[in-house]
Amino acid sequence: MKKYIIYALIPFLFACGGTKTHRSSQFDEAFAKDTRGLDILTGQFSHNIDRIWGVNELLVASRKDYVKYTDRFYTRSHVSFDEGLITVETQSDLRHLQNAIVHILLMGSDANGIDLFASGDVPISSRPFLVGQVIDHLGGSITNTTTAGNFANYLLQNKLQTRRLSNGHTVQYVVIPMIANHVAVRAQRYLPLVRKMARRYNMDESLILGIMQTESSFNPYAISYANAIGLMQVVPTTAGRDIFKMKGKGGQPSKSYLFDPEKNIDAGTSYLWLLQNKYLDGITNPTSKRFAMISAYNSGAGAVLRVFDQDRDAAIVKINSLYPEQVYRILTTQHPSAQARNYLLKVDQAQKSYRVRR
């Protein structure tokens, strides 16, 4: 199993800040206590998982991975939205594995109120998020406890596998492949909201979709080690503050605010608007500006402009003197951040695929 960075747990341990009120000093004090205790809490979790699962077996939620522990952490479910694979495994008996399979197949799409840090079942939803992304052994949709239970029983009887942990414990598990176009199915789910925000901010919907795919693979539970939250991976303390300021609000969006799909897509798209009309204003070629916006969504507008010149105005002049293809090449080869270089490549490719689908 891939070992994920323990700091991905941080956002689950405390909420993001809110607007300034007469309670702000109390909040700041509580926040400080939370951060001081963070190393202890994450260390305890890591130690607990290492004790139960062995070394190099720590698995936590991230941008494109949903992970839920149950059964006192002896059973866990992992959805890789990038790879299109669902792995459910247990060190307990098969009853716990069967229960975990049913719950992962029928989980909802609302991340609010779901504590991925705790060991407990996620409620079964009447509108499962994975409907249309997974089919059962008969080729049918999995929409309720009957179909999920029947499929779970089939998996236990026909697809059960075992592996040995480094601590000597035996794990029983099943791997459920998602359908080939699972990403497109998730994208379709959020298309009405994307179109709404595209109209609101006069933004190309294919750009919004390309960023969403690259940021989270349309995982509504997405969270990163940098505390970026939700479908468009908005960081409350940076982009979030800018967005709230633009909207005439104080403070920054909360975790629950950004786990709301509509508010998250609104926040991400409004940040694109800020990049286009404020931070990167002055770039005249629309294609060059789009490349700069994509790169800036990942690394910040200042970092993008400094690739061309330390002075902002000079950087704008330099960009305007280049063809879009040259801007693209420079940002994908000379940006100091490898992540930013790859980010532009990925988003541009994803955006092209959504333009074709239209």
From Swiss-Prot:
Show the GO cellular component annotation of the record: cell outer membrane
Q: What is its EC number?
A: 4.2.2.n1
Out of the domains of life, which is the source? Bacteria
Entry keywords, A to Z:
Cell outer membrane, Cell wall biogenesis/degradation, Lipoprotein, Lyase, Membrane, Palmitate, Signal
Q: Which reaction does it catalyse?
A: Exolytic cleavage of the (1->4)-beta-glycosidic linkage between N-acetylmuramic acid (MurNAc) and N-acetylglucosamine (GlcNAc) residues in peptidoglycan, from either the reducing or the non-reducing ends of the peptidoglycan chains, with concomitant formation of a 1,6-anhydrobond in the MurNAc residue
Q: Where is the lipid attached (S-diacylglycerol cysteine)?
A: 16
**Lipid attachment of type N-palmitoyl cysteine occurs at which residues?**
16
Q: What top-level class of enzyme does the UniProt entry assign?
A: lyase
Q: InterPro entries of this UniProt entry?
A: Lysozyme-like_dom_sf (IPR023346), Murein_transglycosylaseC (IPR023664), Murein_transglycosylaseC_N (IPR024570), Transglyc_AS (IPR000189), Transglycosylase_SLT_dom_1 (IPR008258)
Give the family from UniProt: Belongs to the transglycosylase Slt family.
What is this protein called in UniProt?
A: Membrane-bound lytic murein transglycosylase C
Q: Which organism is it from?
A: Pasteurella multocida (strain Pm70)
Q: Show the taxonomic lineage.
A: Bacteria, Pseudomonadati, Pseudomonadota, Gammaproteobacteria, Pasteurellales
